[in-house]
Design a protein with these regions (language model features):
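Conserved acidic
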Residues: 1-354
């Protein structure tokens, strides 16, 4: 069911006529499993797809205080001053990571009731399979590589020596970076499951099938269906952490009211991007100067984004590959790098108001 005249949450209104609209609805339906047709909104359709793959019923889970209180601060925006070798570059390029969050729908999520554990021990290469929240401090003045996104930003914003982090974020700190973490307590699920993975595969397969025929015009049936597919899975992640309304029992009974899924997916995507940026820096000597959600900025002497991309990053439409978003003169925003106004400065430049 598509109410195109009223639908402002998906791309149906971009169809130039009824023929293209019908073709787009049909294309999306054919790219998805049976009984997963579009219905009413991206959120409602995504919920139906997830439920379709959980034929035995979606696993229920009790949300611990850090999830309910939205205690986790995500590293979503960062920039740094230029290094000497970057200051002489002419151009600043932005690439977006394709399907960054969809690629993490296989993350382990809790089932049932979490346990409150005091002074838990993180076991390298093992604890990463335990979904949960950890109250963590960093000992000994440790600092991450200053050429990469600032992983200590959440501590500074909180103004506290201890903050709550998810398992994927702690895995990045403890296993990948060997940070000297100290854990005061945790809420951990003894049982966990990658229960979003099957639905993620359906969205991924639809994305690949539709993307293979979309030409980027934004008005044909394939482009419209592809954008609707993306709307579904991106909104589904945010919808897990939607504001709770009504009584607590009603919210708790909704199997897709899952703040933990939102937190774990976002942090898993961040960790994957961080590891990739670290590998790129070591392999090529080129380091990001900024990130904004799933987008990353690099400097270059080359004006063409397809040629300027670091050698270890792959342009393409697949999950985890990169799409070039924009290129601007570096000197237009260089003075804002390292400050809070950088991303606004970029958008003002692109709008022609700077």
């Amino acid at each position: 069911m598509v109410l195109a005249g009223y639908e402002n949450r998906a791309a149906w209104q971009d169809a130039p006529d009824g023929r293209v609209l019908l073709a787009a609805v049909t294309a999306l339906a054919e790219a998805m499993p049976p009984a997963c047709n579009y219905y009413y909104s991206p959120n409602a359709t995504a919920a139906a797809v997830i439920s379709h793959h959980a034929r035995g019923g979606l696993p229920a889970a009790t949300m611990p205080p850090p999830a309910l209180e939205r205690a986790v601060t995500h590293v979503a925006s960062w920039s740094r001053p230029l290094m000497d070798e970057e200051a002489g570059c002419d151009w600043l390029h932005r690439w977006d990571t394709n399907g960054a969050q969809l690629a993490t729908w296989g993350v382990k999520l809790g089932i049932g009731d979490p346990e409150h554990v005091m002074s838990p021990r993180w076991v390298p290469k093992k604890s990463k399979y335990t979904a949960g929240y950890w109250l963590v401090s960093i000992e000994g003045g440790w600092r991450p590589d200053m050429r990469l996104p600032d992983l200590l930003g959440p501590w500074r914003r909180a103004g506290e020596p201890q903050i709550w982090v998810t398992t994927p974020f702690l895995e990045l700190l403890a296993d990948d970076l060997a940070a000297p973490v100290s854990i005061a307590e945790a809420w951990l699920w003894p049982q966990s499951s990658a229960w979003l993975e099957a639905a993620g595969h359906s969205f991924r397969d639809a994305r690949a099938a539709l993307g293979a025929r979309a030409d980027g015009c934004g008005r044909c049936e394939w482009c419209i269906a592809l954008r609707v597919d993306k709307d579904r899975y991106t909104r589904a992640t945010g919808n897990c952490a939607r504001r709770r309304t009504g009584d607590a029992a009603t919210a708790a009974a909704d199997p897709l009211q899952r703040e933990d899924a939102n937190d774990h997916i976002i942090d898993k995507a961040l960790a994957i991007d961080y590891r990739r940026q670290l590998r790129t820096g070591k392999a090529t000597g080129r380091w990001p100067v900024a990130i904004f959600n799933d987008a990353v900025y690099y400097t270059s002497d080359l004006p063409d984004g397809n040629q300027a991309i670091p050698a270890s990053m792959t342009l393409g439409t697949g999950l985890g590959q990169y799409s070039h978003e924009t290129t601007i003169p570096l000197d237009a925003v260089a003075g804002e790098l390292g400050g809070r106004g950088f991303h606004r400065a970029v958008e003002r430049y692109l709008r022609g108001t700077r």
